Amino acid sequence: MTIIKKPDLNNALLRAKLAKGMGHSYYGEPAWPNDLLYTFPIVILGTITCCVGLAVLEPSSLGEPANPFATPLEILPEWYLYPTFNMLRIIPNKLFGVISISLVPVGLGIVPFVENINKFQNPFRRPIATSVFIFGTVTTVWLGIGATMSIDKALTLGIFF
């Protein structure tokens, strides 16, 4: 047995609070003008203040000057360019290498149209997109690791032969 306490609507204090709109849930507040005029500028100014403050307190140094007569043995690009660098390095024909790199975004653009009839969002129920994602991730990691090795081990990673 549950006891339900009903509000006393004859209470003047409760009626005053209800008249002000207290006790009612509006499920959020409007974005205009609350968020766009008040919250966003404060967050943006706070972010700019943090960046400027950190730059003033701890300025970054430029490092040692470049010496053109002391180059490293192997010049590597940044880590996020390793797969592309390795693909261009292991493909002997440069035109075919550039074409193969340009086919990656084309292939990724085709995937939504191939699986357009599938209405599910669950990755286990979208086998084509899931297999393309897994194959692309494994290939990218494989090529990225191979970019840090010598050219004879770049494709096989020294595992197979």
From Swiss-Prot:
RNA-binding as UniProt keyword: no
The organism's place on the tree of life at top rank: Eukaryota
SUPFAM superfamilies assigned: a domain/subunit of cytochrome bc1 complex (Ubiquinol-cytochrome c reductase)
Membrane topology annotation: Multi-pass membrane protein
Subcellular compartments: Plastid, Chloroplast thylakoid membrane
PANTHER family from the UniProt entry: CYTOCHROME B
Protein name: Cytochrome b6-f complex subunit 4
